[in-house]
């Protein structure tokens, strides 16, 4: 599988993926052609590519379909159980992926909220690859997601959404890093982000013009 970086905020991801079935456990460079290979890496010698981590997991799939108003919604649920290995280090994989196959994206969030009400789930936008890079080089992990630049002419609802997405995404990455290494400062920063997010949501009623 070749995955582009795409966009991922607070567990909701949009990206391109290419899948191939290989007969051998070896990278087939012929598959990495111009149809999928990033233009920015066109001068890279693919023969120099070497594995620095591996993922070994079992995936169980199920299709969930229901009616939402007059529209049909289809979601593929995939449960991944296994591990990421980089040298002598390894990390367990226990992920539930929800992929929207048909319908409105809002339905995907509604399903996730219903599942989280009964199961110990937490949104997370950290990929298996990012876990592998972190095992190989702990300094490669970025706690703060890229912040959107706000301008004076940015609409109020756009500014509110940008700040909320940043705080939500950053808080989840802090929680994930705290789970990984247990540094108390990360816990303190995580709680502060949650407080900032709560304050932001509380100020919404004051910022929205009244009719």
Residue ranges and their predicted role:
Residues 1-211:
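Phosphate-end processing signature that detects enzymes handling 5′-triphosphorylated RNA
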């Amino acid at each position: 599988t070749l995955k582009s970086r795409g966009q991922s905020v607070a567990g909701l991801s949009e990206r391109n993926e290419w899948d191939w079935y290989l007969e051998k456990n070896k990278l087939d460079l012929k598959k990495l052609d111009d149809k999928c290979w990033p233009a920015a890496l066109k001068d890279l010698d693919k023969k120099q590519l070497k594995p620095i981590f591996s993922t070994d997991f079992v995936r169980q799939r199920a299709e969930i379909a229901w009616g939402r108003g007059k529209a049909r919604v289809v979601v593929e649920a995939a449960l991944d159980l296994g591990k990421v290995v980089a040298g002598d280090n390894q990390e367990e994989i226990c992920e539930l992926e929800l992929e929207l196959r048909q319908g409105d994206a809002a339905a995907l969030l509604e399903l996730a909220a219903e599942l989280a009400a009964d199961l110990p789930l937490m949104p997370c936008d950290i990929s298996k690859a990012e876990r592998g890079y972190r095992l190989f080089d702990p300094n490669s992990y970025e706690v703060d997601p890229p912040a959107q630049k706000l301008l004076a002419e940015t609409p109020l609802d756009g500014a509110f959404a940008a700040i909320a997405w940043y705080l939500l995404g950053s808080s989840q990455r802090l929680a994930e890093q705290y789970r990984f290494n247990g540094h108390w400062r990360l816990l303190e920063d995580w709680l502060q982000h949650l407080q900032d997010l709560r304050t932001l949501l509380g100020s919404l009623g004051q910022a929205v013009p009244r009719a």
